[in-house]
Amino acid sequence: MGKFSEGLLNDETILANLNICADHTILDAGCGNGYMAKKFSGLVGNTGKIYALDPDRGAIANLKKEVEKTNIEAFVGDITKPTRLKAASIDLVYLSTVFHIFSESQIEGFVTEIKRILKPNAQLAIVNIKKEDTPFGPPVEMRSSPEELRKKVPLIRKTLVEVSEHFYMQVFENA
């Protein structure tokens, strides 16, 4: 989904509202073309690690070519199912413009996997399209308001920030 949101979001606002440090390990789940994974890469430095996960084999194949010899590891996968990532190994999971496509059972799988891979006190950041009529995007009934999102994701709610006219980011913390 990264291709969809690239250029529509205020990346500086997103990055300013995430506590990213050198040496962090970040998962860009549903990374699409990897544009945010690349931004995260520079922030975590040589001691950090970025995992870029997407079910689109073509997008991952292209991204792998682009990020050879970097701290980004791209692989095909689905964050609503168990991944090959180690338990309690991730400082930040970033999910942008993907949550609205999850079914109820996929949300359950997503929450289970997120809780498994996040370190204690680590962050989950979800960027969603606002639940209002917009000139693009999924039908309004597929979208979640911040309140609905908080009910679906049983982590500690932290920051809620507008990241463009039509998008918001909710940051959660793993207890």
Sequence positions of predicted segments:
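A short acidic, Gly/Pro-enriched loop at the edge of an enzyme's catalytic core
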Residues: 21, 83-93
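Class I SAM-dependent methyltransferase SAM/SAH-binding core
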Residues: 27, 33-81
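A short glycine-rich, Lys/Arg-flanked "PGG" loop and its adjoining helix->strand segment in the class I
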Residues: 108-120
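Core SAM-dependent methyltransferase catalytic element
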Residues: 161-175
